[in-house]
UniProtKB/Swiss-Prot annotation:
Its cofactor is FMN. Quinone reductase that provides resistance to thiol-specific stress caused by electrophilic quinones. It holds the Pfam family Flavodoxin_2. The keyword Membrane does not apply. This is FMN-dependent NADH:quinone oxidoreductase. Homodimer. Gene3D superfamilies: 3.40.50.360. The gene is azoR.
């Protein structure tokens, strides 16, 4: 039995989101193909993920014997909790829109929790080495324009998850803002690809 972590990186519901429509289709198809697997869901917009601000980063570099505030201790513990949640999953699927050429800020905060030296990668004399080897990561993204996987959001997500050693792949639905009349056609193609990926994921 494997564990799938489902990461919702959109502030709205599937009614208003093509990426979440794809995510819903993926989960439904995945459950059909892998009925024994455990599925855990994470909504980054409601999870209160600690951001890398002054309070948290100063706590990270404070040292073992430093006196931390209760707030710093809480943020460190919650940050580590999201790292551990990611590490406990065998497979991860992430769905998000592209905002201003990038992923939403809340999703970026989550990504920061899964790119941690000593946990998901390590430094060696030959350079950094990923520690999340064998972990499948599927990224579902909706782009109003057409970017062919060269948009900064996709490049960033690919770089991060390949850096930590995971098996990263992406399926995007794009171009619906250019030609709204083709939205349903583009969505149908997206859903078909997502469902097929879920069967073998």
């Amino acid at each position: 039995m494997s564990k799938l972590l489902v990461v919702k990186g959109h502030p709205l519901t599937a009614e208003y989101s093509l990426s979440l429509k794809g995510l819903d289709a993926f989960v439904k198809s995945y459950k059909s193909a892998h009925p024994e697997d455990e599925i855990e869901e994470l909504d980054v917009f409601s999870a209160d993920i600690p951001t890398l601000n002054t309070e948290l980063v100063s706590a990270m570099f404070a040292g073992e014997n430093a006196e931390l505030t209760a707030s710093q201790k809480d943020k460190l513990a919650r940050f580590a909790g999201f790292t551990d949640q990611f590490l406990s999953a065998d497979k991860v699927v992430i769905a998000n829109p592209m905002y201003n050429l990038m992923i939403p800020a809340e999703l970026k905060s989550w990504v920061d929790t899964v790119n941690v030296a000593g946990k998901t990668f390590k430094y060696t004399a030959e350079g950094p080495v990923g520690l999340a080897n064998g972990k499948k990561v599927l990224h579902l993204q909706a782009n109003g324009g057409v970017y062919g996987a060269q948009d900064p959001a996709t490049v960033y997500m690919s770089a991060i998850f390949n850096f930590i050693g995971s098996d990263f792949r992406q399926i995007a639905v794009e171009g619906h803002a250019y030609d709204p009349e083709k939205t349903e056609e583009l969505l149908a193609e997206f859903i078909k690809k997502v469902e097929l990926e879920a069967q073998a994921f």
